[in-house]
């Protein structure tokens, strides 16, 4: 018996998540697991879940920023589904991406057909002259 215990062994480095390695907030490990379990392909490369998590994080940040602006325009401090709907439908690219998506409690965009608007008539002063 040497009596040394664990003093001479190598110190293992602290575990670092793949999300933190990639500088992401979204979970790379969970995306990888879901890609494997989803029967999308027989094998999933190491870079695929990182890329997909980055894309999901970017899209989420974009939608939340626009929804936050919509909430601020309505003098609210909390984002509700209506703000998400307004943000997505007023952005051309997001509207194209999420065109077939229905957002619960989102409502519709305010829109009045031009034909239904009252016709512009001359003012009273112009008629009297």
Swiss-Prot record:
PROSITE patterns found in the cross-reference section: HISTONE_H2A
Residues recorded with modification N6-acetyllysine: 6
Localization annotation: Nucleus; Chromosome
Keyword Nucleus appears in the UniProt entry: yes
Cross-linked sites for Glycyl lysine isopeptide (Lys-Gly) (interchain with G-Cter in ubiquitin): 14, 16, 120
Residue segments, region Disordered: 1-22
InterPro entries: Histone-fold, Histone_H2A, Histone_H2A/H2B/H3, Histone_H2A_C, Histone_H2A_CS
Keyword terms: Acetylation, Chromosome, DNA-binding, Isopeptide bond, Methylation, Nucleosome core, Nucleus, Phosphoprotein, Ubl conjugation
Phosphoserine found at: 2
One cellular component term from this protein's GO annotations in UniProt: nucleosome
One term of GO molecular function: DNA binding
Main localisation: nucleus
Pfam families, per the entry: Histone, Histone_H2A_C
Segments of skewed composition (Basic residues): 7-19
Modified residues (N5-methylglutamine): 105
Chain positions found as N-acetylserine: 2
Family (UniProt): Belongs to the histone H2A family.
Role: Core component of nucleosome. Nucleosomes wrap and compact DNA into chromatin, limiting DNA accessibility to the cellular machineries which require DNA as a template. Histones thereby play a central role in transcription regulation, DNA repair, DNA replication and chromosomal stability. DNA accessibility is regulated via a complex set of post-translational modifications of histones, also called histone code, and nucleosome remodeling.
Subunit-structure text: The nucleosome is a histone octamer containing two molecules each of H2A, H2B, H3 and H4 assembled in one H3-H4 heterotetramer and two H2A-H2B heterodimers. The octamer wraps approximately 147 bp of DNA.
Name this protein carries in UniProt: Histone H2A.J
Species whose genome carries this gene: Gallus gallus (Chicken)
């Amino acid at each position: 018996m040497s009596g040394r215990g664990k003093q001479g062994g190598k110190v293992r480095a602290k575990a670092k998540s793949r999300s933190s390695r990639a500088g992401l907030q979204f979970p790379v490990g969970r995306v990888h697991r879901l890609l494997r379990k989803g029967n999308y392909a027989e094998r999933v490369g190491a870079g695929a879940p990182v890329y997909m998590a980055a894309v999901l994080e970017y899209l989420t940040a974009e939608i939340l920023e626009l929804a936050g602006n919509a909430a601020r325009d309505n003098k609210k401090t909390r984002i509700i589904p209506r703000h998400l709907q307004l943000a997505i439908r007023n952005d051309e690219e997001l509207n194209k991406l999420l065109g077939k998506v229905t957002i619960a409690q989102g409502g519709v965009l305010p829109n009045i057909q031009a034909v239904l608007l009252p016709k512009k008539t001359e003012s009273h002063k112009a008629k009297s002259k």
